[in-house]
């Protein structure tokens, strides 16, 4: 039951981030994601190591998505400004929420490196496609180019999250 809350809470918060941007409330999603993480920690009595992972990937994830934006292949809507190419808060919130699933609803992926790579390479781009369909991001390059880049980035990121999680534990 706890893992069900974990994945549903993350998914609801993820959609709140995307739809919040679409409808001009770009801070609604991050607030809901913060609430999800607070409730998550009260339910799971998570260890300090999990908090370290979440904070670490708040930074790493923001850097990754900032780098993606700076390649010019996509634009994040709901950003701080169009001139400042830093991934917006709602993207950082998504990274934090995703990391809260690693030791719980996604724990079955631990040490399954090829599966982690495949899951990242497939579902990472699908998340961005959904974000693009709901106008949270705009692709600036061809659909194929954007998705090849995202597949590579997420194919590496998911195993990296699990690897660093194992080192932090």
What are these language model-derived features?
Residues 1-169:
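Aromatic-rich, lipid-facing transmembrane alpha helices and their immediate juxtamembrane interface loops
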